[in-house]
């Protein structure tokens, strides 16, 4: 029997190598991989982000465009596989569709609570309007009260560094 965690790690490594070796085709390749096994969308996105952080947001957004129902899996996979890149990816997702903000932020921070600061910084960079950012923080608090403090702390740190 195949261990699903080992299989996910292996698929992530393949996606990472692909993103590093063929960055211009990384999104298209990741979508093809995801279409053949949607259950591994997070592993694919996380691996691609770890393999080439410069294309992480583009790859993730292309994957979301191909199957919007997997947006939370993709955000969680990036937070798990490449936490430093999670902010840019989740920020791009929120900027593209503010209606998914609470879900993707919650998915990313649930997958890897240590990514909360990066996620908050990415969201703040993508949503510079203070009122909108406060609204997103309220949605995050409602969706995941345990993660709300870490997210708010990450936003505060991001504001200090602006």
Where does each model-flagged region fall?
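Conserved small/polar residues in nucleotide/adenosyl-binding loops
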Residues: 1, 160-162
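Fold-core signature of tandem repeat domains
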Residues: 10, 14-19, 26-34, 41-49, ...
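Low-complexity, charged, repeat-rich alpha-helical/coil interaction segments
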Residues: 113, 159-160
């Amino acid at each position: 029997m195949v261990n699903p965690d080992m299989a996910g790690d292996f698929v992530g490594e393949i996606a990472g190598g692909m993103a590093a070796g063929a960055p211009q085709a990384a999104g298209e390749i990741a979508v093809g991989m995801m279409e053949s096994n949607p259950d591994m969308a997070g592993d694919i996105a996380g691996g691609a982000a770890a393999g080439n952080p410069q294309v992480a947001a583009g790859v993730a957004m292309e994957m979301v465009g191909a199957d919007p129902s997997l947006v939370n899996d993709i955000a969680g996979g990036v937070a798990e596989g490449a936490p430093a890149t999670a902010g840019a990816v989740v920020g791009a997702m929120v900027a593209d569709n503010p209606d998914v903000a609470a879900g993707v932020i919650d998915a990313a921070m649930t997958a890897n609570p240590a990514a909360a600061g990066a996620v908050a910084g990415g969201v703040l960079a993508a949503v510079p309007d203070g009122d909108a950012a406060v609204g997103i923080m309220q949605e995050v608090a409602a969706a995941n009260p345990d993660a709300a403090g870490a997210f708010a702390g990450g936003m505060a740190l991001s504001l200090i560094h602006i």
